[in-house]
Each structure stands twice: as structure tokens, then as C-alpha cells.
Amino acid sequence: MTSRRAALGSEGGARIVDRGYQHYTGERRGPGWAVLAIATGTMRRSLGFKRPGLAKLLPFLIVGFAFFPGLAVIGFRVLFTGRLPRGVLSADRIFPYDNYLNWLHLVVLVLAALAAAEALCPDRRQRVLSLYYASPIRPILYLFGQVVAVVVLLLLVSVLPPLILWAANVGLADAPLSYLTSHLDQLLRIIAAGTLIACLYAALALAVASFTERRAYAAGALLGGSLAVSAVAGIIRGTIKDRWAQYPGLVDPLFLPARTTRWFFGLSLQSQISGWLYLAAAFAIIAVACFAVVRSYRSVRF
């Protein structure tokens, strides 16, 4: 037997020299760093790092769609300052922040579908959750890391682009300091609206992704389901004139963020429903979606 192994080793050009196990001698940083590693790894995968072809291109196209309108407005103002009447180049007239956020919430929805599917589906399909849970990472910490990854990624496209536009408007104003003090409330409204949009779509996307192991199914279900619910709610609002017909908008994933954003910016909702009720509906959807994710992972077999 020994001679046969030696012969095989000599013919194949490879042989076993030694076997054994070594203890990990690196720094042990605890569960917090493990959660951070999960979050950063998910963000990198969601943005297409170390992935081929379309998986790398599509996320950056989505992020580009988020930043392009704001950068275009900034470029227009820089190029035509002094050539057009001052009122024409007013920041609020060219591209109001609420309009920008209404555009962004559609972009955020698409990115949420991709990011949440990338966060939850591969580990379940490859049956590696037991490897996470064998470490100090408990299921709730694992989910927390994935939630952080998706929310931070969505904040990148829901808050940062309008913040850049706001900062540019401050810098391009005739009296930047005066503009800053008089428009500081706009900064807070941008942060509040963008954060709500990111959290709402992150919760919905993660809830959908927690029920399937395939990324395409998760992304398709979120996008298709959102369009279907929005279409039904829109038909009800458009065809039925009773007051109750406006309430399906509280569960419309496309209509609800737009109404809440208008309310944040003090604009008319053109509805008998209070802005507080829209906000409460958004929080309720987030809570139900988070409950669905936790409940789904309690029943996962691995």
C-alpha cells in the first residue's frame, strides 16, 4: 500500500508532506467586527465587485442614474451663470428637491431589489448559514449585518445625490451664507425623506428576498409586485370617487414615498389623508416587513 502511494505520488508529481491543524493566531475582534465584515462584503457584492459582466455594470448604471440629474443641473448652472436672468437659474425652479427625490425613489426601488437579493439569497442557496451560526454570529446579528449593508447602499442613492445638489446650490448662491441659513430646513427635509425611502424599500426588498433562494425571483417579485399593487391602487383612486378610495395609497409602494416626500417639504398632498397617516403607514410597513424577515429566518433549515 505504501509503495503504491509512493508510486502514485512520484508519477503525479505531488505528495502529502504533513497533516495537522493550527490554532488561529490573529486578532479576535468580536461579533461587532464580524457584523461589519458581513455588511461590507454584501455591499461589495451588491455593487458588482469581483463579479463578471452585467453583474458589475448594472449596479453602477443604477447609481449613475441617481447622480446624473443633480450633476446635470449643477453643470447647467455653472455654465449659464451670468448669461441668463437670475430667476431662470433659481435652484428651486430648475429642479426642486422634492422632484429629485420622487425620481430617486424609483431608482432606489430597483437597487433595493438587486441588493436585498444579493444579501440574503446566495447564503441560503449555498447552505452556508450554519457556518455563520457556528461562530459568535447569532441569526439576529447576521440579519442586522445584512440590513445595515442594504440600507447604507440605498442611502448612497437616496440621500447623497440631493445633498450634493443642495451643497452646490449653497456654493453657487449670490450670498452663500445667507442661502445656507435660509435653506437649512431643506437639508433636514432631504435627509428625512431620503432616509425614509431607503428604509422603506430596504425592508420590503429584504422581506421578499427572505422567502426565496434565487436572486432573480426575489428581484422580480419585488419589482413586479410593486408595479401590480401600485396599478391596482391607482385604478381604485382614479375610478372611485368615495373618500375611502384614497386609502389604498397607504399601501402603494410607489405612491406612498412620493406623498410622504411632498409632506416633508410642506407641499399640498391634494388629498384628505393627513401626512402623519402616510408617515405612520410607512413605519407600519417597515415594521411588518422586518417581522416577516425575522420569522422567515427562524424557520430556515440548514
Locate the predicted segments by residue.
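Short, contiguous pre-domain boundary segments
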Residues: 10-29, 293
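Short, membrane-interfacial amphipathic segments enriched in basic
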Residues: 24-40
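Helix-loop-helix units of permease transmembrane domains in multi-pass membrane transporters
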Residues: 119-149
